[in-house]
């Protein structure tokens, strides 16, 4: 295990020496600190100098990574080996964006011809829709696309479509429906016309309860207008690996886009699940997204650990979680179009590394995945930054900021960037009580007021953050960013010895929900439940359970 290694013992000793140091002093003592603790790939700059580290920290973390076999684990992923240990499958999302022409094998078969065939199928379909060659049952072109999916079949495409708003195709609007709450579906459909709407039903197994319920409701809505099952073929396509269930639903198998069991749901936006993205921004832009991710893949695969962006990012997370005892990670993009990135990364990280059992079946004796959360700046400054600056919990922050905007309000963007850089500096530097006193005295406040306010206006600082800066948010840059986080998560899972590619924790609740759904229709649906759940079931049916 992680804590049994020699490198871990050395890291613990080092932590005891460095933890009392303040980053303000580290910067004062080292004018080259930024140059030594920053990395770049193309126009993506990763500044990790505002972390509680020195050269020895990085060396010891890389020693730990080597002792835990990280380099071998990276090679195994790219080789298509079954690194998803519980399900005995590869986790080969890197094949979906492989632009090198290099073969990638699963069980002796080069999967790239199949990957490229689906990409070609997607391109043909997107071009048909965009050109107007693909028309609805009345002969009108498609104007609205509704993606019905949940989890990885929704979060990734939804986030990417928001992020790439400046690249949206002018004739196509893309909508997303994921929640089983009928409000989301009905709110989406109320402004759409059946004759110009195309539905994408996205489910690997085509058995996801929420997705199928919404898909059936959407088909009923469509059929009330179309009055003919033969019209479904022009308005419904499936993204799935289960041909038989697609046919049973009533979708022509010719309108099915497939992907494979070595594509995990939370890594599936790079597959045919990304069809909504391709329809929304065009296939050329979708392939730029893939190319950006591939560039990060190649960097991750080949760069030495000390110069490897995902590796360093992942090791810093382990440093804080397992030595400093942090329990959460804030993601703060200073870009409104990345407002859904924290939610996307919640699934990517928490579903991947929210595990307490190693691949060997042993219980871990240390903390693993953090709670991931965040909001775009500057909104977050007016919500939770108080806790980041003066709260009692140490919470590492990732800032993301583009140098240039797609929009013409240059002054607004300058204010945005200035705030991002200021927050990063403020978290690191803090403000001593003496500095707060001096500032208030310069403002002319009386001594009694200064004495009263001084304890409240000091900031401890020494709060760590990373900053990811890029020229402008483009499809290629977005692809690099998302692949960076995917690989960072894998790095941490590999060091902890857990499986970052399964999600058994979601199963029990789904099983119980199926049973409760049946019991809600029974006379006395209380058997087999605790008193609380039984009372709540009765409450649904209007029976009195409130305390008197």
From Swiss-Prot:
Family: Belongs to the GPI family.
Compartments where located: Cytoplasm
SUPFAM superfamilies, A to Z: SIS domain
Gene3D superfamilies referenced in this protein's UniProt entry, alphabetically: 1.10.1390.10, Glucose-6-phosphate isomerase like protein, domain 1
Residues spanning the membrane: none
InterPro entries documented for this protein: G6P_Isomerase, G6P_Isomerase_C, Phosphoglucose_isomerase_CS, SIS_dom_sf, SIS_PGI_1, SIS_PGI_2
CDD domains tied to this protein: SIS_PGI_1, SIS_PGI_2
Pfam families found in the cross-reference section: PGI (PF00342)
Known catalytic reactions: alpha-D-glucose 6-phosphate = beta-D-fructose 6-phosphate
A biological process term (GO) from this entry: glycolytic process
Pathway: Carbohydrate biosynthesis; gluconeogenesis; Carbohydrate degradation; glycolysis; D-glyceraldehyde 3-phosphate and glycerone phosphate from D-glucose: step 2/4
Native source organism of the sequence: Syntrophotalea carbinolica (strain DSM 2380 / NBRC 103641 / GraBd1)
Active site: 351 (proton donor), 382, 510
Top-level taxon in the UniProt lineage: Bacteria
Protein name according to UniProt: Glucose-6-phosphate isomerase
């Amino acid at each position: 295990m992680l804590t049994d290694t020699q490198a871990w013992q050395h890291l613990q000793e080092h932590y005891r020496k460095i933890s009392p140091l303040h980053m303000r002093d580290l910067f004062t003592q080292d004018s080259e600190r930024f140059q030594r603790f920053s990395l770049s790939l193309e126009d993506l700059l990763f500044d990790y100098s505002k972390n509680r580290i020195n050269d020895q920290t990085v060396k010891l973390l890389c020693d730990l990574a080597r002792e835990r076999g990280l380099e071998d684990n990276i090679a195994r992923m790219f080789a298509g080996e079954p690194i998803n240990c519980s399900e005995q499958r590869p986790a080969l999302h890197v094949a979906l964006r492989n632009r090198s022409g290099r073969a990638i094998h699963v069980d002796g078969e080069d999967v790239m011809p199949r990957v490229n065939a689906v990409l070609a199928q997607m391109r043909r379909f997107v071009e048909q829709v965009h050109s107007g060659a693909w028309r609805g049952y009345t002969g009108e072109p498609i104007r609205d696309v509704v993606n019905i999916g949940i989890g990885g079949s929704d979060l990734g495409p939804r986030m990417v479509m928001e992020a790439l708003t400046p690249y949206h195709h002018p004739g196509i609007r893309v909508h997303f429906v994921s929640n089983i709450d009928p409000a989301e579906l009905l709110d989406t459909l109320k402004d759409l016309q059946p004759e110009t709407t195309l539905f994408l039903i996205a489910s690997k197994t085509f058995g996801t309860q929420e997705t199928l319920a919404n898909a059936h409701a959407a088909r009923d809505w469509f059929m009330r207008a179309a009055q003919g099952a033969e019209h479904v073929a022009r308005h419904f396509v499936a993204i799935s690996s289960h041909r038989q269930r697609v046919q049973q639903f009533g979708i022509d198998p010719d309108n099915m886009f497939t992907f494979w069991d070595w594509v995990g749901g939370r890594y599936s936006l790079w597959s045919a699940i990304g069809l909504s993205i391709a329809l929304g921004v065009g296939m050329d832009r979708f392939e730029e997204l893939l190319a950006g991710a591939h560039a990060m893949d190649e960097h991750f695969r080949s760069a030495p650990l000390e110069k490897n962006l995902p590796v360093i990012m992942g090791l810093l997370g382990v440093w804080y979680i397992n030595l400093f005892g942090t329990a959460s990670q804030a993601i703060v993009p200073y870009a409104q179009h990345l407002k859904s990135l924290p939610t996307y990364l919640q699934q990517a990280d928490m579903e991947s590394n929210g595990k307490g059992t190693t691949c060997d079946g042993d219980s871990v004796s240390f903390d693993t995945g953090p709670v991931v959360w965040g909001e775009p700046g500057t909104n977050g400054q007016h919500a939770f930054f108080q806790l980041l600056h003066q709260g009692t919990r140490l919470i590492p922050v990732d800032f993301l900021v583009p140098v240039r905007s797609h929009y013409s309000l240059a002054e607004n963007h300058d204010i945005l960037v200035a705030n991002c850089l200021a927050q990063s500096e403020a978290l690191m530097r803090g403000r001593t009580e003496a500095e707060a006193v001096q500032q208030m005295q310069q403002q002319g406040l009386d001594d009694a007021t200064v004495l009263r306010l001084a304890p409240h206006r000091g900031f401890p600082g020494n709060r760590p953050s990373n900053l990811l800066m890029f020229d402008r948010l483009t499809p290629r840059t977005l692809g690099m960013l998302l692949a960076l986080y995917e690989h960072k998560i894998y790095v941490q899972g590999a060091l902890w010895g857990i499986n970052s590619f399964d999600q058994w924790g979601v199963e029990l609740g789904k099983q119980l929900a199926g049973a409760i759904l049946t019991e809600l229709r029974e006379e006395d649906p209380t058997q087999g439940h605790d008193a609380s759940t039984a009372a709540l079931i009765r409450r649904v049916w209007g029976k009195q359970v409130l305390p008197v």
